[in-house]
């Protein structure tokens, strides 16, 4: 619980104002992805494989710069942006994360997380781990 509180304290500083949702269909390497509705996302909870990716200085799908010292994640079909709780099954650690990018595009993976999140959840060195992802809010949270 202490870790979760720590995550919440630095959840929004430095994030740009975003008044809406990015939910348009898109295509990657010939595969079309259709993001879920906001209503469906508000009830979303899934378990699967999380992978670590590094996008230091890259621009995410909503136009936000992603840095290794910030919390960010990528999901194929959640409306962007949204806020999720990610819990690592092996370590029991949880973190609150903003989903601001698209991916992962490797079969069998549920979510990609940045360096800071992978370290906080305890799987940075492993690269992959089983997690549960639960949506907390969608868009600007209103």
State where each predicted segment sits.
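Sec-dependent bacterial lipoprotein signal peptides
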Residues: 1-7
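Secreted/periplasmic proteins
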Residues: 7-142
